């Protein structure tokens, strides 16, 4: 049911009649921004309209702010104003007339801009229709064309001659350099020559960031449903939205796209092409002052476009959308961008994204700390180092005579560094000096060698300036594809970018990070990991007016306060957890502590108990007998799931399960996930048979996959999925937490409790993420079984999402009682559906 944007009961201009919990969430977000909170922590279960609630509350606040602070006669003109035209000597009617004139000018300027956007949008669509490129008033999305394979020659893989900062380039054209510098200065002085010169009088923007491309596209589609009251008079104010993407999403140059295989590569290829004589055909040399790029930036604001539609605009206009859209940043109200751009201060500066005094909204924020950590971490093994050395030697052998001395010397030094790292790992293994999680003193890598003469600072600068990594990677790919099997073993895309990242960490190790030993499947590695993500996030928190963190599974929220912004006072943090939109009787949550008098506790020491594994099988058989349609079972790991299934295959447990429901297993290969899901859904929906899906916490199906309606009538969580306590990451992180606690004056026992709490919270966030997969809309219903006696603990229950916690059966039911209630639950739902 749609409501008018002007009606009092629809304060937030929601496109539909909002549910009570949506109004509560919108109220909480608006209050957080309006009352000066620095941080807002919000949990809203998936399926409750979280994205629209975020959009409506933040945009309503922004329009209110603009109306009161930009387009009001008193805005910015208080008694301290010293302008002679509004002095205390003037009569009040003169002051009012002056203020009205200022506001009128601002409003007229915005009215003109709105009309201009309407005009260019209509012109563009008419031109496209005339050309026969669209068939409706809203252009259907065109499939982006696949890059054609470009013919690449050896010269394409050569870097420019390299000279360090202390070297002088021979025959440097000083006049050319001077002319370039003068041209840049003139650009700054003259500014751009816009068809309509516009400046944004409102310093506040909304930045919406999420983890994946699909989530950002969904945001654009939800935003397109909305319409908000204008902040000024005279014309309807459109929502000015700009999606910021990477070159990989926005590049329209086929040569660049065919040359590049990953994000780092495409950036280097693009910059390299701009420096070349021919340049990029889609990027005007003076693109900052180009009317074509200006028009594309304005067109991008004329209506809500997702990132593919922005790329299509650029293709149709034959102008680079990546560089053009950034010109529209100044006039936007709301900008969407991926985590990687938001969290990089240097990238924000390049794109002219000013978060000062703005609202920063981070969706799916349960991923935020992991994303920050992974962006500033790197891991490298002997095998990878050997592959890098092979690639470097192969490249040098081919181009040795064509490379200048600067490139040759630095590439040989890079080989030397890789050999030193290999030697260091091998010596440490021989001396039994490797203990997973133990810190590495990087100076030990050069011990008893001439490695300290390499000057890794200069080496890192060489890799950064020369952009040689993508040249080598691309050449190795070409040779591997066309000629030489040896090169195939040498090609290890994108390992050269990994050594670049490794060198950056060696050169500038953060005091909040550590180098340490790690091991995966018996393979030793050196790992650098950022241990304190708050140091990176502080830049955003300190600059923004307000930071809103939202997610479907934000509990335990204490983790964010402790590790992401420990410096923010509690009184400046607002937390809010939504209930679910479903009626209270549409979800039951049962802790399952025992079966056949066997206690179910899947702790590390007890998890292989054969009696308990048999009891687990009996429990799942009974659940399959009582629950219709689909059942999803989550195990702590692939290894444990396979172990359990192998035991059940040797007994009759799997036979009993398969007599009730068709069995599916989560594949380890991502390419097989959609096939398994389709078969699972088809069995339930089309064949009208029951099915059971064995999945893994943190696997392919625990996040982003929805088991709505009959696909997930029950979710079974087996045990508490603690991460591997003996992994290098966990050991290093817990040591860091303990050392930080002791530095603050805590006792050793308090410090250990802090690190144990962190470890437990990792587990509970994974639980919340997995069990939230089943309820997707207001009429959905399901049962959650938490199979482990430890779920009876109030400490564990308090770390579950609030909407789950509120529905836990607190009576200590045995399995017979749970199954009786299960049958009653589904019988009632069947009767209600048929009534």
UniProtKB/Swiss-Prot annotation:
Pfam families documented for this protein: DEAD_2, Helicase_C_2
PROSITE patterns to which the protein is assigned, alphabetical: DEAH_ATP_HELICASE, HELICASE_ATP_BIND_2
Residues in Helicase ATP-binding domain copies: 8-421
Record: residues binding [4Fe-4S] cluster: 251, 270, 280, 320
Known EC number: 5.6.2.3
Catalytic activity: Couples ATP hydrolysis with the unwinding of duplex DNA at the replication fork by translocating in the 5'-3' direction. This creates two antiparallel DNA single strands (ssDNA). The leading ssDNA polymer is the template for DNA polymerase III holoenzyme which synthesizes a continuous strand; ATP + H2O = ADP + phosphate + H(+)
Name the record gives this protein: ATP-dependent DNA helicase CHL1
Lineage: Eukaryota, Fungi, Dikarya, Ascomycota, Saccharomycotina
């Amino acid at each position: 049911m749609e409501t008018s944007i002007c009606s009092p009961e629809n304060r937030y201009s929601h496109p539909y009649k909002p549910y009570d919990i949506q109004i509560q969430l919108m109220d909480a977000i608006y209050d957080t921004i309006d009352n000066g909170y620095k941080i807002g922590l919000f949990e809203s279960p998936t399926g409750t309209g979280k994205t629209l609630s975020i959009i409506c509350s933040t945009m309503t606040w922004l329009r209110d702010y603009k109306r009161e602070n930009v387009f009001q006669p008193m805005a910015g003109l208080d008694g301290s104003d010293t302008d002679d035209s509004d002095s205390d000597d003037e009569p009040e009617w003169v002051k009012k007339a002056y203020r009205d004139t200022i506001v009128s000018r601002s409003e007229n300027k915005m009215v003109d801009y709105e009309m201009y956007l309407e005009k260019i949008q209509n012109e563009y669509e008419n031109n496209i229709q005339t050309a026969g490129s669209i068939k409706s008033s809203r252009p259907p999305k065109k499939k982006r064309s696949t890059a054609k394979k470009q013919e690449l020659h050896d010269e394409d893989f050569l870097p420019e001659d390299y000279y360090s900062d202390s070297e002088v380039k021979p025959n440097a054209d000083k006049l050319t350099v001077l002319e370039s510098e003068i041209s840049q200065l003139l650009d700054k002085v003259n500014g751009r020559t816009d068809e309509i010169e516009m400046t944004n009088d409102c310093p506040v923007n909304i930045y919406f960031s999420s983890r994946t491309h699909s989530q950002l596209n969904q945001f654009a589609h939800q935003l397109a449903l909305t319409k908000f009251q204008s902040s000024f008079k005279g014309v309807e104010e459109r929502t000015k939205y700009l999606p910021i993407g990477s070159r990989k999403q926005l590049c329209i140059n086929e040569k660049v796209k065919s040359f590049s295989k990953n994000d780092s590569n495409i950036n280097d290829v693009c910059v390299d092409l701009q420096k070349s004589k021919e340049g990029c055909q889609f990027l005007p040399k003076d693109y900052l002052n180009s009317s074509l790029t200006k028009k594309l930036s304005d067109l991008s604001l004329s209506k809500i476009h997702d990132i593919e539609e922005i790329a299509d605009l650029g293709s149709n206009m034959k102008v680079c959308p990546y560089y053009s859209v950034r010109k529209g940043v100044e006039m936007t109200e709301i900008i969407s961008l991926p985590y990687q751009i938001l969290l990089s201060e240097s990238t924000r500066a390049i794109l002219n994204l000013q978060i000062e005094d703005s609202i920063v909204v981070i969706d799916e924020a349960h991923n935020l700390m992991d994303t920050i950590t992974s962006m500033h971490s790197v891991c490298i093994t002997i095998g990878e180092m050997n592959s890098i050395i092979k690639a470097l030697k192969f490249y040098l052998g081919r181009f040795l005579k064509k490379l200048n001395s600067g490139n040759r010397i630095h590439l040989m030094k890079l080989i030397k560094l890789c050999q030193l790292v290999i030697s260091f790992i091998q010596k440490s293994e021989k001396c039994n000096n490797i203990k997973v999680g133990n810190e590495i003193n990087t100076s030990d890598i050069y011990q008893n060698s001439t490695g300290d003469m390499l000057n890794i600072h200069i080496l890192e600068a060489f890799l950064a300036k020369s952009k040689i990594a993508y040249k080598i990677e691309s050449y190795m790919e070409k040779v591997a594809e066309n000629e030489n099997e040896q090169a195939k073993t040498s090609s290890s895309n994108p390992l050269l970018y990994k050594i670049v990242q490794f060198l950056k960490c060696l050169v500038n190790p953060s005091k909040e990070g550590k180098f340490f030993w790690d091991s995966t499947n018996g393979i030793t590695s050196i790992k650098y990991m950022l241990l304190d993500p708050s140091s990176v996030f502080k830049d955003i928190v300190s600059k923004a007016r307000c930071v809103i963190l939202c997610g479907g599974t934000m509990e335990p929220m204490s983790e964010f306060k402790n590790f992401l912004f420990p410096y923010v006072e509690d009184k400046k943090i607002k937390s809010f957890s939504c209930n679910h939109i479903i009626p209270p009787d549409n979800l039951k949550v049962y802790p399952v502590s025992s079966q056949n008098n066997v206690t179910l506790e899947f702790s590390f020491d007890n998890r292989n108990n054969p009696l308990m594994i048999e009891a687990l099988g009996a429990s799942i058989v009974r659940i399959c007998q009582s629950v219709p349609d689909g059942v999803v079972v989550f195990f702590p790991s692939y290894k444990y799931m396979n172990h359990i299934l192998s035991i059940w295959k040797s007994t009759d447990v799997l036979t009993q399960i398969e007599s009730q429901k068709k069995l599916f297993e989560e594949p380890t290969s991502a390419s097989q996930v959609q096939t398994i899901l389709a078969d699972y859904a088809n069995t339930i929906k089309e064949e009208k048979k029951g099915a059971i899906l064995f999945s893994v916490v943190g696997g392919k199906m625990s996040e982003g996959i929805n088991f709505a309606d009959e696909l997930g009538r029950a979710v079974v969580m087996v045990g508490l999925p603690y991460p591997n306590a003996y992994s290098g990451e966990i050991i290093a992180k817990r040591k860091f937490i303990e050392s930080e606690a002791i530095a603050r004056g805590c006792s050793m026992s308090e410090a250990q409790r802090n690190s144990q709490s962190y470890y437990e919270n990792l587990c509970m966030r994974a639980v919340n993420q997995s069990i939230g997969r089943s309820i997707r809309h207001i009429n959905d219903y399901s049962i959650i079984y938490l199979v482990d006696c430890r779920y009876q603990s109030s400490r564990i229950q308090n770390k579950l999402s609030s909407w789950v916690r509120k529905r836990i059966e607190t009576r200590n039911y045995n399995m017979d009682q749970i199954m009786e209630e299960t049958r009653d639950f589904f019988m009632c739902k069947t009767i209600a559906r048929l009534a």
